[in-house]
């Protein structure tokens, strides 16, 4: 868990007095780094009695084309602007360029938040 509330120090370094104790709503979670592999999912309880599906790993992508959408198999992550190391480690995030059996595609969904990987074709 990561605390995402106000810092105990101001930007000049002075101590800030707490307004209240830390609350559960100020906690965050570690990022889900979706990898290429056998499909694995995890459900997480979130606010409002809801659930969020996180993709831990997958090898399937929904590729949108001009004529519709098709299901394709992910072969490799060729580039990832979020972090150069993500491409080396085959981690899929929004905006990543992936190689599929249907061609090169850019990921448009957030796999750690949406529970699936959607992408659009990239013409080279």
UniProtKB/Swiss-Prot annotation:
Compositional bias annotation for Polar residues: 106-124
Listed GO MF terms: structural constituent of ribosome
Intrachain disulfide bonds: none
Bias kind Basic residues: ranges: 1-22
Region feature (Disordered): 1-40, 102-124
GO cellular component: cytosolic small ribosomal subunit
Sequence similarity: Belongs to the eukaryotic ribosomal protein eS8 family.
This protein's name: Small ribosomal subunit protein eS8
Organism the protein comes from: Halobacterium salinarum (strain ATCC 700922 / JCM 11081 / NRC-1) (Halobacterium halobium)
């Amino acid at each position: 868990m990561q605390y995402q509330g106000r810092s105990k120090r101001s930007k000049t370094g002075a101590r800030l007095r707490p307004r209240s104790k830390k609350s559960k709503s100020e906690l965050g979670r570690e990022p889900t780094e979706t990898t290429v592999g056998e499909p694995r999912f995890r459900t997480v309880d979130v606010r409002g009695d809801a659930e969020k599906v996180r993709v831990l790993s997958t090898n399937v992508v929904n590729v949108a084309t001009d004529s519709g959408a098709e299901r394709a198999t992910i072969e490799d992550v060729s580039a990832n602007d979020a972090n150069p190391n993500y491409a080396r480690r085959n981690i899929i995030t929004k905006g990543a360029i992936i190689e599929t059996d249907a061609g090169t595609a850019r990921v448009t969904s957030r796999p750690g938040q949406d529970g699936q990987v959607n992408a659009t074709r990239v013409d080279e």
